[in-house]
UniProtKB/Swiss-Prot annotation:
Interacts with glycogen synthase 2 (GSY2); possibly also interacts with phosphatase 1 (GLC7). Gene3D superfamilies: Carbohydrate binding type-21 domain. The gene is PIG2. One of its GO terms (cellular component) is cytoplasm. Pfam families: CBM_21 (PF03370). This is GSY2-interacting protein PIG2. GO terms for molecular function: glycogen binding; protein phosphatase 1 binding; protein phosphatase regulator activity. One of its GO terms (biological process) is regulation of glycogen biosynthetic process.
Length: 538
C-alpha cells in the first residue's frame, strides 16, 4: 500500500497545510501522489522543493477569445468593469438602480451577469474590497512625519471647496425628480468634476518673432483692436463726392478721374505737404507751357515780365533742390552729414506754422527727399541705386490724406530674379520695441520707366499711424526697412534687404490733431491727386 508523506517546509521543517482546492490540484498536479516504478514497486517520494512564486494566485486564461466583439463593445465593457463604487461600505455594481435609471436596469441586467463571468475569467481579484481613504468616509490616512519631525505634505490635491458639491450628473444618475439628494450615501468620487480642457477653435494665432515679447504682442493687439493676418486691399475713402465708401487706388489712377477732378485738386492755398515741396510747382509748370504755346500773348500781356521772372525763380529752386538731394545721396562722412542736416533745417523753416506746429506731411530724417512731384530727385535716386547694383530699393513714399484717416503709400523697385517674390516692409513706431509687417503687392513692371532693366514695381501701404508714447501728439516717428525674398536659379533661397545702408529709413509723420471733416484752408483732394504714382521721366 502506497504511503504519502506531508511535504515539509523548506525553511521551518514543519508540515504545510495545503488547501484542498480542485483548481490547484488540476493546474499544478497532486504533489502528494506516489510515483510507481516500472517494476510495479512503489517508491517513496522525497519532499519536493517548493518555490514561493507557486503560491501566487495566477489568473486562468480565457476559455474562448471574444474575437467577434467590436472595439466599442470592449470599451464599454472595460468602462463598466472600472465602475466599482461603494455606498456605506458595500460594493455596488455600475448598473445599480441608484446609478442608472430604472428604465434601463432590466435591459442591462443580463449583460451584468455575463460581464461578471468574464471578470472572473480575467481577474478574480477585481472584486477585492478596496476603498479610497478620505476624510469624508471617516477613514483619514495617518500622518507621516520625517526624521526631523516635519510633517510630510501630501502631493495629492483635494477637491476644492469652492466647487459646487451637487453637479448635474448626480441628479441624472439618481433617477429622482427631486433636486434634493442625500449626499451621505453618495460616494465622494461622484462629486469630483472632470478636469478636461476645452480649446476654442476660432481663437486667432499670433506668430512671435525672435525678439518679440508677450507684452509687446499685447500692446499690438490693443492698438490694432483685432488680429488680422490677411492682406488689406489698397483703398481710400472717397473724398471726391463727400461719401464714405472705399474707392480702390486703381480707380483713382485712371486718367478719367484725374481729368474730371483736376481743377478741384489744384485748389490749395497752403500747399506744403511732402518733404517741404511746394504745391505751386505744378501751377507754375502749367503757366510755363502756356508761355511756350503762345508767345504773342506774352508780348501783349502787361504782366508778362512778372510771369517770366516767376518761371526763372522756380527753375532756380528746382536746380537747388536737385543739388540738395544729390548731396544727401552722396554722404560719406559725419561732417558732411551734420552740415547737410543743418542746411536742411534752415531750408525747411517754411515747414512751420507759427513757432511750434508743422503742417501735415512726411519729414525725412536720414535719407534724401523721395517725392513723386520732384521727378528729378526720383530719377536721380533710381540711377544711383541701379549703379550700386541693389536688387531692392525704395523708390518713393508719400502720405495720402482723407477725411477720416491717413495712409502712407510707397513704391519699391525689385530685380526680377525669379517669378516667385515676396516683399515685406517691416516698420515700427516705438524704436523697435514692437514692429509690424506690411506685405507689398505687385503694381507693374518698370519697362515704362527703365526699358530693359528687368525690374518690377511693388507698392505698400501703412495705415496704422499712431504714437504709442504719446497718444495726444500729432507727430509719430516711423522707422522701416524692406525685405526681399525670392529663389535663385538653383532653387536656393535668396534674401535681400534695403535698410538705408544699415541705418533704416526714419520719417517724422505729422498728422492733424483732430480730423472731423474737410477744412477751408487745406483741401485733402489736392494731396490725393499729387500723391499718385507717376512716371518721373515724362
Amino acid at each position: 500500500m502506497a504511503t504519502t508523506t506531508q511535504p515539509q517546509n523548506i525553511l521551518m521543517d514543519e508540515p504545510l497545510n495545503l488547501p484542498n482546492n480542485s483548481a490547484h490540484n488540476n493546474n499544478y498536479g497532486n504533489i502528494n501522489a506516489n510515483i510507481r516504478t516500472f517494476a510495479g514497486m512503489s517508491m517513496h517520494m522525497h519532499p519536493a522543493r517548493l518555490n514561493s512564486l507557486e503560491f501566487l494566485h495566477k489568473p486562468r486564461r480565457l476559455s474562448n477569445v471574444k474575437l467577434h466583439r467590436l472595439p466599442q463593445d470592449e470599451l464599454q465593457r472595460n468602462t463598466d468593469m472600472n465602475k466599482g463604487m461603494y455606498f456605506n461600505g458595500k460594493q455596488v455594481h455600475a448598473h445599480h438602480p441608484f446609478i442608472n435609471s430604472g428604465a434601463n436596469f432590466n435591459a442591462h441586467h443580463q449583460d451584468v451577469s455575463k460581464l461578471g463571468e468574464e471578470e472572473d475569467e480575467i481577474s478574480p481579484l477585481s472584486h477585492d474590497n478596496f476603498q479610497y481613504e478620505s476624510e469624508e468616509n471617516g477613514n483619514p490616512s495617518p500622518p507621516i512625519y520625517k526624521k526631523s519631525g516635519e510633517l510630510v505634505k501630501s502631493s495629492l490635491k483635494r477637491r476644492s471647496k469652492s466647487l459646487p458639491i451637487t453637479p448635474k450628473s448626480i441628479f441624472n444618475k439618481t433617477g429622482s425628480k427631486s433636486k434634493h439628494v442625500n449626499l451621505d450615501h453618495v460616494d465622494t468620487r461622484l462629486l469630483q468634476r472632470s478636469k478636461s480642457v476645452h480649446f476654442d477653435r476660432v481663437l486667432p494665432i499670433k506668430l512671435f518673432n525672435e525678439n518679440e515679447k508677450p507684452i509687446d504682442v499685447g500692446k499690438q493687439m490693443v492698438q490694432q483692436d483685432v488680429l488680422n493676418f490677411k492682406h488689406k486691399p489698397l483703398t481710400r475713402l472717397s473724398a471726391l463726392n463727400g461719401g464714405s465708401d472705399s474707392v480702390p487706388i486703381e480707380d483713382l489712377l485712371s486718367e478719367n478721374n484725374q481729368n474730371e477732378y483736376g481743377d478741384t485738386w489744384l485748389q490749395n492755398p497752403k500747399g506744403v505737404f511732402l518733404f517741404g515741396t511746394n504745391s505751386n510747382n505744378r501751377r507754375n509748370k502749367k503757366k510755363k507751357f502756356k508761355l511756350s504755346d503762345d508767345d504773342s500773348d506774352i508780348e501783349n500781356d502787361n504782366d508778362s515780365d512778372d510771369a517770366i521772372n516767376r518761371l526763372v525763380r522756380q527753375q532756380d529752386k528746382d536746380q537747388a533742390h536737385l543739388a540738395h538731394g544729390l548731396k544727401n545721396l552722396l554722404i560719406n562722412d559725419d561732417d558732411d552729414y551734420l552740415e547737410t542736416r543743418t542746411n536742411s533745417a534752415k531750408s525747411g523753416a517754411n515747414l512751420f506754422i507759427g513757432n511750434s506746429k508743422r503742417i501735415v506731411g512726411l519729414y525725412n530724417k536720414n535719407f534724401p527727399i523721395l517725392s513723386d512731384r520732384n521727378r528729378k530727385s526720383l530719377k536721380l535716386n533710381i540711377f544711383l541705386n541701379l549703379s550700386r547694383g541693389r536688387p531692392v530699393f525704395l523708390q518713393e513714399i508719400t502720405l495720402l490724406t482723407g477725411f477720416h484717416n491717413m495712409v502712407i503709400i510707397g513704391k519699391v523697385f525689385v530685380k526680377n530674379i525669379y517669378f516667385d517674390k515676396k516683399i515685406i516692409v517691416r516698420y515700427t513706431w516705438d524704436a523697435w520695441r514692437t514692429f509690424h509687417e506690411s506685405e507689398c503687392v505687385y503694381f507693374s513692371n518698370a519697362n515704362g520707366i527703365l526699358p530693359g532693366s528687368n525690374m518690377d514695381i511693388f507698392k505698400f501701404s501703412i495705415d496704422d499711424i499712431h504714437n504709442p508714447n504719446d497718444k495726444d501728439s500729432n507727430i509719430s516717428q516711423l522707422e522701416f526697412c524692406i525685405q526681399y525674398l525670392t529663389w535663385g536659379v538653383d532653387r536656393s533661397r535668396k534674401e535681400y534687404w534695403d535698410n538705408n545702408d544699415s541705418a533704416n529709413y526714419k520719417i517724422d509723420v505729422v498728422t492733424n490733431e483732430t480730423r472731423t471733416g474737410p477744412t477751408t484752408d487745406v483741401n485733402d483732394n489736392y494731396e490725393m491727386k499729387h500723391s499718385l504714382f507717376r512716371n518721373p521721366f515724362h
